[in-house]
Amino acid sequence: MNKKILQILEYDKVKEQFMNALTTAQGQKELSDLVPLTDKDKIQLLFDEVADFRLLTQENGLLNLGKTNDLTEILRRLELEASLSGKEFVEIKKVIQLGINIQRFFDEAENVETPSLNITLEKLVDLSGLIKKLEIFDNAGSLYDNASLELMHIRSSIKSHQSEIRKIMQEMLTKNLASLSENVITIRNDRQVLPVKAENKNKIAGVVHDMSASGQTLYIEPNAVVSLNNKLNQKRIEERQEITRIYRELAEELKPYSFDIRQNAWLIGHIDFVRAKYLYLAANKASLPALTNDKDIILFAARHPLIDAKMVVANDIKFDRTLNTIVITGPNTGGKTITLKTVGLLTILAQSGLPILADDGSRIHLFDDIFADIGDEQSIEQSLSTFSSHMTNIVQILAQADENSLVLFDELGAGTDPKEGAALAIAILENLRKRNVKTMASTHYPELKAYGVKTQQVINASMEFNIDKMQPTYHLQLGVPGRSNALEISRRLGLPETIISEAGQQISGSEHDVNQMIEKLEEKTREVIESSRNIKKIERENQSLHKDLTKVYNQINRERDFELEKAQKEAQEVVKKASLEAQEILKNLNDKAALKPHEIIAARKELEGLAPTIDFSKNKVLKKAKAQRGLKQGAEVNVTSYGQRGKLIRLEKDGRWTVQMGSITTRLSEEEFEVIETPEQIQAKTKNVSKKVTSKVKAQLDLRGMRYEEAELELDNYIDQALLANLIQITIVHGIGTGVIREMVQKKLQKHRHIKSYEYAPINAGGSGATIAILK
């Protein structure tokens, strides 16, 4: 879409309204880079994300996001093995922690599905293992004492030396107070000193580190603490060295994950942007319009987003597929220009995936481009007149617009002779109409009213004017051409009636009749609009009530199901416990030969009859699993609880099997017996064992952090498993690093006879940090 239309319609100013709701640098960057799209599927996904986030928030509250800064430069330096500061490590930590928090929020969310947002969430890499490594920093970027044992010992020594020095210095301060210019211990050259009067310098033996500007005070380090200060400085050097070592090791550990950290940062930014869209939608009563390719622009209660919400006037604009052109006629200052800009701006915002200030049910056609000639764009440098400037712009628009463009003209044909201007305006509109270019134009030429009446696919419109208040209402009236109110306004302003009467006589009868007809149309239109608004109000109230009732109904059902499931589990647990105890008793009795086998079985069946029954016999998943285990009618089994063989008779509704052991029949759970495999089953299982082993092979192998030999062996094994699993495509993540692992991977792939082709992954999927291979 051309940049000029974005400037004319002040697209960037509207984007700024989303900025305050963003908390991440990545989200702000995504907003800054945002431009209108033409791909319907991409735009619809952006709308679906906002809709899903709205449902998520309604059920689980608003997702809280912390502030993060841009990691681009930090990660670049990390990859170049440049040193990072403590604050930079903290910035990395913030992004990683925020990713973990977002994932946890969605995992714990209840009563809602978010399929569109899951597309983003699935790309989030779990970096929770890195958080522990970064917890050695406080929020200011300083290392905690326990960052390492060595650092803890060094800082303990520093504190001990400082305490000893402070004690000695305090004693000397008290003892030599008369010789000092100030009752204070100060610092010079990173060492504690006393401010000694120049005339008393020989009274305190020590090292002079500085002198006051007047020369009256010498800053002396007493000899009593020189040795201790030397030790203290040595410990501080050791502290800096240890901190440098910790930073270096931490950077080496983070480097293999730089791509994942960068990707998470942008994914977090995207979630942040979705959140900002939702907040805008909720705060401004905005909506997500339906997207069409049928040239419908239908806006209910459309408002311009840059006009104060208390001042803006909402308009219904029906510019559907049956219309090609809308001609807005009438006097200036009535809101024609704002109406044109509103249509253009809301269309651009919708094509950017942003909520628009219009009611639900609005529809937006997706245009390839939008062109506008709005306002006074006279070029002073080119010394063009207003008319010439507009006409130059119009010529360019006519050359570039096609049937999938939207064209907006403000005061078309103005700036020249009225008759010629009107003729040009009609000719331009007719040219665009014949080319099937959707066009909205404003004009004050009355000749265009007739064009709007007699031409197919063209409709007149006007901006309502309140005669009683003598001011425009800024309401758009579709189907009603504009009319002049000059005589009536003049009468109300006190112009003599004789002059008004004489002016009226100059107007032809037909023109007078037309004005009366327009006045009646305006009254009828107002009635229809008012009736339509009342209907929509009732519809909104009904929708809101239906939504609330549905929410309550679903909540009641969820609570009911939860309580039923809870009660069922508790009952089963109680019975299971009692059954186990009973089995133990029966087993003991059986061991003592106190009861006969059939008496034991009868007793146990009676006990098990206490358990609540659940019909598992129709569960397809369980049936499939049982079939895979060989559990079917007639199968031979070994009953472990009795140490006897038996045969499966049938599967009961409670999930247990009726098993026959000789002349005895009983019900047993699957845990109480094992299937005895036939030779044929053993042979079939042997043939398929490799297939089962490889059925869980993932389509991605991560070699980051491995040594060369380890990575080489892992790659060989993985390719074998992928071939056995019949995978078509695999991804090997090797990172960027020094390139050694990457070269090894590509050499292996090049030589392997089962690799058809390979290439680096796309930029958004790892770039040169990952290789995608196609298997033969």
Curated annotation (Swiss-Prot):
GO terms for biological process: mismatch repair; negative regulation of DNA recombination; rescue of stalled ribosome. SUPFAM superfamilies: DNA repair protein MutS, domain III (SSF48334), P-loop containing nucleoside triphosphate hydrolases (SSF52540), SMR domain-like (SSF160443). InterPro entries: DNA_mismatch_repair_MutS_C (IPR000432), DNA_mismatch_repair_MutS_core (IPR007696), DNA_mismatch_repair_MutS_sf (IPR036187), MSSS (IPR046893), MutS (IPR045076), MutS2 (IPR005747), P-loop_NTPase (IPR027417), Smr_dom (IPR002625). The keyword RNA-binding applies. PROSITE patterns: DNA_MISMATCH_REPAIR_2, SMR. ATP binds at G330, P331, N332, T333, G334, G335, K336, T337. One of its GO terms (molecular function) is ATP-dependent DNA damage sensor activity. Pfam families: MSSS, MutS_V, Smr. Residues 701-776 form the Smr domain. Keywords: ATP-binding, DNA-binding, Endonuclease, Hydrolase, Nuclease, Nucleotide-binding, RNA-binding, rRNA-binding. Its EC number is 3.1.-.-, 3.6.4.-. The keyword rRNA-binding applies. It is an enzyme of class 3 (hydrolase). Belongs to the DNA mismatch repair MutS family. MutS2 subfamily. Homodimer. Binds to stalled ribosomes, contacting rRNA. Endonuclease that is involved in the suppression of homologous recombination and thus may have a key role in the control of bacterial genetic diversity. Acts as a ribosome collision sensor, splitting the ribosome into its 2 subunits. Detects stalled/collided 70S ribosomes which it binds and splits by an ATP-hydrolysis driven conformational change. Acts upstream of the ribosome quality control system (RQC), a ribosome-associated complex that mediates the extraction of incompletely synthesized nascent chains from stalled ribosomes and their subsequent degradation. Probably generates substrates for RQC. This is Endonuclease MutS2. It comes from Lactococcus lactis subsp. cremoris (strain SK11).
